[in-house]
From Swiss-Prot:
InterPro entries: Aldolase_TIM, DeoC, DeoC/FbaB/LacD_aldolase, DeoC_typeI. This is Deoxyribose-phosphate aldolase. NCBIfam families: deoC. Catalyzes a reversible aldol reaction between acetaldehyde and D-glyceraldehyde 3-phosphate to generate 2-deoxy-D-ribose 5-phosphate. It holds the Pfam family DeoC. HAMAP family: DeoC_type1 (MF_00114). It is found in: Cytoplasm. One of its GO terms (cellular component) is cytoplasm. The keyword Cytoplasm applies.
Amino acid sequence: MTPTRAQLAAFVDHTLLKPEATAADVAALVTEAAELGVYAVCVSPPMVPAAVQAGAGVRVASVAGFPSGKHVSAVKAHEAALAVASGAAEIDMVIDVGAALAGDLDGVRADIAAVRGAVGGAVLKVIVESSALLALADEHTLVRVCRAAEDAGADFVKTSTGFHPSGGASVRAVALMAEAVGGRLGVKASGGIRTAADALAMLDAGATRLGLSGTRAVLDGLG
């Protein structure tokens, strides 16, 4: 059954992570988010105060180690903690994809655990860059990384930053990730979801949250 506009909006993190974003852009994002009825907005750590100050009762998410994941774990943890202290209720962190490809799952777990320990009760989503793992390794690697995220205390696994050259979310990746975590964690599909059909396909594959930058266009596409 096709969700209503309001039902689809409730899955959405309305996202603005472009480096050129200003405080005014973030305020406009929050206003639009309130109008559309989305679940949350997602902004970079320096923009969290602007999102909170914009008010409207909109939940705020932020990121850590974004977009490369090539940060010392302590730096990711501190960045995440600062975002939470500024008012973020959720953190989307990026793993070290190179460590995952090298089979260093202990390192991946430790990296995630460092951020988990720094954010208290905030929701922690772990970005695994699923397209990169599938292109440069295999399905088993993606599954193992998702299970490592679960072991380390993640609340969600997330497909993509949307900035990696390998691409964004895919139905195949979402289905694999949903199977890997078996309903114990949420699955966020993000990156390249531009139409209502894209969004519905991700939900059908097992996504429980959607990261969208063109939210209005997606919702309008429901007809």
